[in-house]
A protein has these predicted regions:
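Rossmann-fold dinucleotide-binding core
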Residues: 14, 137-204
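NAD(P)-binding Rossmann-fold cofactor-contacting core
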Residues: 26-50
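Rossmann-fold NAD(P)-binding glycine/threonine-rich loop
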Residues: 86-154
């Protein structure tokens, strides 16, 4: 299987590469594609070292040529950030002037990101369709995932969007219940960030009432939503629902704090310095602060099932 990653120069890419390496011989070729040549070379070389650490027989290459990179691909992952972190910081700040939440996937900021991103993703997808293998899948990681993936589907692309909210809940619930995550089956209502967990089945038995009874403060704290809201709902909302349930509080907090984009930009600069170390061959702990917990696990499971 050839996997092409569009936006492969992201500092997050090594998280994906680590997951792809664990797919074993299923992945024969991994191509990272990005217009930022210097950054791509750093991430690409580090990705090669990750594959070697696992003893993976597949090749890892990189290119700034989108058309060449996606040619013959079985799966194309799209993880773009049009405008980079500078645009993200704008998305997280301009809504505050209107008394609205500033966030890259929700509200006015999310809509602005979608308007910038969808045309670019559709162009990329058209080029993938023209050059990838017949029947190739597009896997979208690009936020806002719901809007971007819907645009891909409406344009007739064979695409699926991936979000880490569900797998994050699965892992958290499994830890609290002290069971293997694979045994937890969620009743996951909603799409992408606008979601609620209505049940958590283990061996056919819904254990969510038990979780709410025994771990309500912990669950509420994890999603930053008042415990009384969870108790009233009888389910666990995505932490993104905090922007709706606690809108005014979030706006006040955002006005007094650095944006998430500013923090991510700082983390990215440090990560790139770390990736340049030729002795580094495993993802650093700092990558966990970049965001996207469990994305590689979700991606591995999804791509293996395609």
């Amino acid at each position: 299987m050839k996997i092409a990653v569009v936006g492969g120069g992201s500092t997050y890419t090594p998280e994906l590469v680590d997951g792809f390496a664990r797919l074993g011989s299923m992945v024969t070729e991994l191509v990272l594609i990005d217009p930022a040549a210097d950054r791509l070379a750093v991430v690409g070389a580090f990705s090669q070292r990750i594959f070697r650490r696992y003893g993976h027989p597949g090749s890892v290459t990189w290119t700034t040529d989108l058309d060449a990179g996606v040619t013959g691909a079985d799966v194309a992952v799209i993880q773009l950030r049009v405008g980079g972190q500078i645009a993200r910081i704008s998305d997280e700040t301009f809504p505050l002037a209107c008394g609205c939440v500033g966030q890259e996937t929700t509200g006015a900021g999310g809509l602005a990101k979608a308007l910038r991103t969808v045309p670019v993703v559709l162009d990329v997808a058209d080029r993938i369709r023209a050059r990838a293998r017949e029947g190739a899948w597009i896997v979208d990681f690009t936020n806002p995932v719901g809007i971007v993936t819907r645009a891909l589907l409406d344009a007739g692309h064979k695409a699926v969007g991936l979000c880490n909210v569900a797998i994050g809940f699965q892992r958290r619930f499994a830890g609290l219940l002290r069971v293997d995550p694979s045994t937890v089956v969620l009743d996951h209502a909603g799409l992408n960030h606008l979601t609620w967990e209505r049940a958590a089945y283990v061996d056919g038995v819904d254990r969510l009432p038990e979780l709410l009874a025994r771990h309500l403060p912990e669950l509420a704290g994890a999603v930053e939503i008042p415990a009384e809201v969870l108790a009233t709902l009888g389910c666990v909302p995505s932490y993104y629902l905090n922007y709706f349930y606690n809108h005014d509080k979030v706006v006040r907090e955002e006005r007094d704090a650095p944006t998430r984009g500013q923090r991510v930009a700082e983390i990215e600069a440090t990560l790139l310095d770390m990736y340049r170390d030729p002795s580094l061959d495993e993802k650093p702990a700092l990558l966990g602060e970049r965001g996207g917990a469990y994305y590689s696990e979700a991606a591995v499971g999804l791509i293996a099932a395609l």
